[in-house]
């Protein structure tokens, strides 16, 4: 066993090349074992073991700086830099982040979780090094689809002119989360097919020196390659051909399925906990496919995450030309959706809440100023969604709801969601975003939802009319509002329950109507409070006698949190909200 004796890169440097091959096998076995229990990025890490071992073997981290794009491929790096217990000891599995984290190790230089940033960050480190007159290697590790993002192109454009040491490792595994899309990847294919010799070379055209490695999973070949580029005095791209999922046959054969996985059974590859009932992702894909069949101008759009709205490989094939994967390029997705709408098509862009912030300028400039009727489906907007600091899904309400011309809708159940989706696709007056419920598919509420929301613009649904206190439950939290109202009945209070439906405007008529028989308005939203929906209500009532109690999530970066504990810390449990209401009323 070699891995048990590796506590730093220095320990690894004592091994022979043959011993390093055995070390790689041990690391891969440990990765598969941990990921089968803990879940995480399977394929990307299994494919990067040899390259990471070779990089640490040849280079001198942390003096030499490694910047991993997204940093979801950094597990082997962590194993070699004093954190192997988090991959070999089940009691320590939760001790490290799934991404690089400077608080864990001096070998990690940035907290990274979104894509296409590594070259930009590395070029900054290289420039600072040059300004300070220092000497060390700066390495950006990018690939697994990340080259399709616009910032990657911007970073390469700048890095090519640095005129000093800068090594860009392109991990070419022929995949993103799903298959790669974009003209760049045709050039990568050409370079693979010609062993890096093709005269048409994107990286050389950008101004980089270039070196190709045909087998990036051969540790000896990778050591030779890193030895050639170490201490180089100009920018160079090291293009390595790797196998995503290397060493685990199910991950090799099912690359999209094993990009990231919940805990799985190693012998079969099956999830240990079967997928639950049909979610909003599958519901959305099936509904859009039916619309596409009837209307060839309906088009689904993804920025490298087709599963966000249920477009599995077979559904993408059924959609054909009516489905577009932009690569991991949210800016392109929003801008193109705007132009598709302008041209008479009916685009629907599905995106996770955490990634919509990557396209904020396009939302404002390309979409909303032009007032083009594209539809954006925002998934997983909730404290209960992704719980690491780089993927928080808490900020979409302030970001989206405050852009002029945008209509941001918050459905409360399956039927309301589908009526809003149908209206959004067919209407031609507004850009529309829909905050898709993130807490599982809620069934029918026995309500006749409108088929045309234009006459209903900003109108509340008064789900129950009571007195004393009105509880406004936004989207996910409408059910929470109902629960709190039921608890208040036990104290003799018949609370009004409101579904606001629209996050971009207020029903001032009904807000005025509440003044006559209510002394307290409570807002509940599953997102950050600052700049959110509740503040709109509080500002409306201003210095009047109406009390307003806003409940949501405090503004902070939180990492690897327990969802239940965070709801409690923000006083968002039914018992806490009920108690706070009673305290104010009394």
Name the predicted role of every residue range.
Residues 29-36, 95-111, 133-139, 312-324, ...:
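Glycine/charged-rich beta-loop-alpha catalytic/anionic-binding loops adjacent to active sites
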Residues 86-96, 161-175, 368-380:
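A glycine-rich helix N-cap at a beta->alpha junction
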Residues 263, 271-274, 385-387, 407, ...:
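Peripheral docking tails and interdomain loops at the edges
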Residues 108-264, 270-277, 281-282, 286, ...:
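Glycine-rich ThDP/TPP pyrophosphate-binding loop and its adjacent helix/strand module
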Residues 1-79, 204, 215, 239:
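N-terminal amphipathic, basic-rich helices that act as targeting or association modules
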């Amino acid at each position: 066993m070699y891995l048990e004796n590796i506590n730093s890169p220095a320990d690894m440097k004592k091994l022979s090349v043959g011993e390093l091959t055995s070390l790689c096998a041990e690391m891969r076995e440990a990765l598969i074992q941990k990921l089968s229990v803990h879940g995480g990025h399977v394929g990307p890490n299994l494919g990067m073991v040899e390259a990471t071992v070779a990089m640490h073997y040849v280079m001198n981290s942390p003096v030499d700086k490694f910047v991993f794009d997204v940093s979801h491929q950094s597990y082997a790096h962590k194993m070699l830099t004093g954190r192997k217990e988090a991959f070999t000891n089940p009691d320590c599995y939760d001790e490290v982040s799934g991404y690089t984290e400077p608080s864990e190790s001096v070998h990690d230089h940035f907290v990274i979780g979104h894509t296409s940033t590594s070259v930009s960050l590395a070029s900054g480190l290289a420039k600072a090094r040059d300004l300070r007159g220092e000497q060390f290697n700066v390495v950006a590790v990018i690939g697994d689809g990340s080259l399709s993002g616009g910032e990657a192109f911007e970073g390469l454009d700048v890095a090519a002119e640095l005129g000093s040491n800068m090594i860009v490792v392109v991990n070419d595994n022929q995949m993103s989360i799903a298959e790669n899309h974009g003209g760049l990847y045709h050039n990568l294919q050409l370079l693979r097919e010609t062993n890096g010799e093709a005269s048409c070379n994107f990286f050389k055209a950008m101004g980089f020196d270039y070196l190709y490695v045909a087998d990036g999973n051969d540790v000896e070949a990778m050591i030779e390659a890193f030895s050639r580029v170490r201490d180089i005095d100009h920018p160079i791209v090291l293009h390595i051909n790797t196998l995503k999922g290397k060493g685990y046959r199910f991950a090799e054969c099912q690359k999209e399925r094993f990009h990231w996985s919940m805990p799985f059974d190693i012998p079969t590859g099956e999830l240990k906990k079967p997928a639950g009932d049909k979610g909003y992702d599958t519901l959305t894909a099936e509904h859009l496919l039916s619309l596409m069949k009837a209307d060839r101008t309906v088009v689904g759009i993804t920025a490298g995450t087709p599963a966000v709205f249920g477009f599995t490989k077979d559904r993408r094939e059924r959609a054909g030309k009516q489905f577009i994967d932009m690569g991991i390029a949210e800016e392109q997705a929003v801008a193109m959706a705007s132009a598709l709408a302008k041209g008479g098509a009916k685009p629907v862009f599905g995106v996770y809440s955490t990634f919509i912030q990557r396209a904020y300028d396009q939302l404002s400039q390309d979409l909303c100023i032009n007032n083009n009727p594209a539809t954006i489906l925002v998934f997983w907007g909730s404290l209960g969604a992704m719980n690491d600091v780089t993927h928080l899904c808490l900020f979409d309400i302030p970001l989206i709801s405050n852009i002029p011309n945008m209509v941001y809708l918050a459905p409360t159940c399956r039927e309301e969601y589908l009526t809003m989706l149908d209206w959004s696709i067919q209407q031609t007056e507004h850009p529309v975003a829909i905050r898709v419920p993130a807490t599982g598919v809620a069934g029918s509420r026995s309500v006749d939802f409108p088929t045309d929301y234009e006459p209903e613009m900003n109108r509340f649904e008064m789900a129950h009319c009571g007195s004393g206190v009105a509880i406004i439950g936004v989207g996910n939290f409408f059910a929470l509002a109902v629960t709190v109202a039921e608890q208040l009945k036990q104290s003799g209070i018949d609370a009004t329950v409101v579904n606001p439906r629209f996050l971009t405007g207020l029903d001032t008529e009904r807000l005025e109507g509440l003044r006559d028989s209510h002394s307290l308005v409570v807002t509940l939203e599953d997102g950050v409070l600052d700049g959110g929906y509740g503040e709109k209500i509080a500002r409306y009532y201003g210095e009047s006698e109406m009390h307003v109690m806003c409940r949501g999530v405090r503004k902070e970066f939180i990492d690897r949190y327990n969802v239940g504990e965070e709801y409690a810390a923000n006083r968002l449990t039914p018992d806490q909200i009920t108690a706070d209401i009673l305290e104010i009323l009394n």
